[in-house]
Amino acid sequence: MSEQIYGIHAVNSILTHSPERLIEVFVLKGREDKRLQPLLNELYSLGIGVQFVNRQTLDKKADGEVHQGVIARVQAAKELNENDLDEILANKQNPLLLVLDGVTDPHNLGACLRTADAAGAVAVIVPKDKSAQLTSIARKVACGAAETVPLIRVTNLSRTLRDLQQNHNIWVVGTAGEATETIYQSKLTGPLALVMGAEGEGMRRLTREHCDQLISIPMAGSVSSLNVSVATGVCLFEIVRQRLGS
């Protein structure tokens, strides 16, 4: 089974981290971009087929999404699950995890993956139900982070959170607008799982009940909430700030 990846950063990331998955690459004919030539040189050296096509063909393949003149057809990645998460955590001393509960927009998933990578998160955990798929759009928005940050799909999110607490000694912190303690009042330097809920609805009840602590982002203006990917960035980089200072 194959899937498409588009955008220079996303294709570069697959080339760097999983070149064996590349099947063929489509490039816009006449495209002049200094970032493209090193990519083409690497593809040629690996013997990966490159086809130069017109814009109409690329636009059709990308379903109208921005593709930056390059699309790769790749073998579908293996879906990671709870067992893979245990292996990842076995080698980490002070892990930071991002948990997304009910985030169904692929743009938001991609943005959260990109931020998770920048913040040093070892994995992003999502439930199998009511969660965005790692589509071409999500990979494009992730800007290569979809190949570097493991995306773990779990059958039962509440059970996974309990396992993190009991078997990996990870503190589970959930975000909730009504929480009286803000992220800036919380100590977030140890092994941690940050749980972000869907926009509007927030975390599901069982997810909330399995959090060790609830925190909020203080809002100084008239809006009552932030986009989930923006809120994720605020929270993750407050955690990064605290860790750097500890």
Curated annotation (Swiss-Prot):
Pfam families in the cross-refs: SpoU_methylase, SpoU_sub_bind
Coiled-coil positions: none
GO molecular function: RNA binding; rRNA (guanosine-2'-O-)-methyltransferase activity
Reactions listed under catalytic activity: guanosine(2251) in 23S rRNA + S-adenosyl-L-methionine = 2'-O-methylguanosine(2251) in 23S rRNA + S-adenosyl-L-homocysteine + H(+)
EC numbers for this chain: 2.1.1.185
Task performed by this protein: Specifically methylates the ribose of guanosine 2251 in 23S rRNA.
Database matches in HAMAP family: 23SrRNA_methyltr_B (MF_01887)
Protein name: 23S rRNA (guanosine-2'-O-)-methyltransferase RlmB
Taxonomic source organism: Haemophilus influenzae (strain ATCC 51907 / DSM 11121 / KW20 / Rd)
